[in-house]
A protein has these predicted regions:
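Ordered, amphipathic secondary-structure segments that act as subunit-interaction surfaces
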Residues: 88-97
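Long, low-complexity, Lys/Arg-enriched
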Residues: 1-84, 97-144
């Protein structure tokens, strides 16, 4: 993996955890609004510099209330960075949805941190589970 696409989260630790583990050459923070970018850019640069690391960092925004724009933007990022992985440990719900759709449609690997095992897992290997048809198996009465 040369490029890590990090779904930008409010929690700084979730934004750097995969980078610390995998040390990508390029880190793309996806989903941060411009104000978040300006507030955090220096912090992340200082963090990586303090660790002796210098990944190329990009911040790419999209309208996080428009699924078509989020999908199109993420698909463009993936096409421009074919050797990429998407970390879905954090991020906004709409970005997580778009990442899942990209995993199925474009074959991009998804990773997520498992707090119980303290390891990252490639969750895109479970494609059959993502396509499972659960309709008809449960109804509202099962929960009451």
């Amino acid at each position: 993996m040369k490029t890590l696409i990090e779904l930008f989260d409010e929690s700084p630790i979730l934004n750097v955890l995969a980078s610390v583990a995998f040390k990508p050459e390029k880190l793309i923070f996806f989903g941060a609004d411009p104000l978040q970018v300006e507030e955090s850019r220096g912090d992340y640069n200082r963090f990586f510099k303090s660790r002796g690391e210098s990944p190329e960092i990009e911040y790419i925004s999209a309208d996080m209330e428009n699924i078509d724009e989020v999908n199109d933007t993420l698909a463009k990022i993936i096409s421009e960075n074919p050797d990429c992985v998407v970390d879905v440990t954090g991020g906004k719900d709409i970005a997580l949805l778009a990442a899942g759709m990209a995993a199925v449609k474009l074959g991009v690997p998804l990773i997520a941190y498992n707090r119980r095992t303290k390891k990252y897992a490639n969750i895109s290997k479970y494609e059959h589970a993502m396509r499972a048809n659960i309709f008809g198996l449960l109804d509202c009465e099962d929960f009451f």
